[in-house]
A protein has these predicted regions:
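Extracellular jelly-roll beta-sandwich "head" domains, especially the C-terminal globular C1q domain
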Residues: 5, 13-16, 27-173
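Acidic surface patches and DE-rich sequence motifs
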Residues: 12, 22
Length: 173
């Protein structure tokens, strides 16, 4: 004897929709927050402190704010974040001097926690630009925010758009 279970909507225990099944049998889930932002400048420069990535390539859920550089979680969960850019030695975008360093990290709710991944770049033997990259998987409650912070030296950007630092992230689950 065959049994048929007719389901159109799956709900979380708090009553929010987890998934729906359309008339063709496809399972549809609510959009998951995801974004990709970049820092774009009109000239050659170095940026420091909390970085405000002023252009968005996409922002599913409208969680990234180009006015303050923060991704604010609208949904509690586990998130993946990534930053990439070139380190610079001055606010004018100059190369890192021999023996100089740059530190880049994620700040959660305005501070760097013990959990936070960071990259610490140190030049030795030559003045140059060096790629900086930070990746982390972070648990956020709804309304927690993440931003990128450069603690020492600078991150490089120029008007060509070829060297725009980027910040991206998405909800894993």
């Amino acid at each position: 004897m065959a049994s048929i279970l007719g389901v159109e909507t799956l709900q979380h225990t708090n009553g929010t929709t987890a998934a729906t099944i359309d008339s063709t049998g496809r399972i549809l889930t609510p959009a998951r927050p995801a974004f990709h932002a970049r820092y774009s400048s009109s000239g050659t420069e170095g940026v420091q402190g909390d970085i405000v990535f002023n252009e968005e390539d996409f922002d599913i859920g409208s969680n990234y704010d180009t006015s303050n550089g923060r991704f604010t979680a609208s949904v509690a969960g586990i998130y993946y974040f990534c930053f990439e850019g070139l380190s610079a030695g001055s606010s004018g975008g100059g190369v890192l001097a021999d023996g100089a360093s740059t530190e880049v990290c994620f700040h959660k709710n305005g501070s760097q926690g013990a959990w936070s991944s960071r990259t610490y770049i140190y030049t030795q033997g030559a003045s140059n630009y060096i790629t900086a990259s930070v990746v982390d998987i972070i648990q956020l409650a709804a309304s927690d925010y993440i931003q990128v912070n450069v603690n020492s030296n600078y991150i490089y950007s120029d008007a060509s758009g070829n060297y725009d630092p980027t910040f991206q992230g998405f909800l894993i689950g």
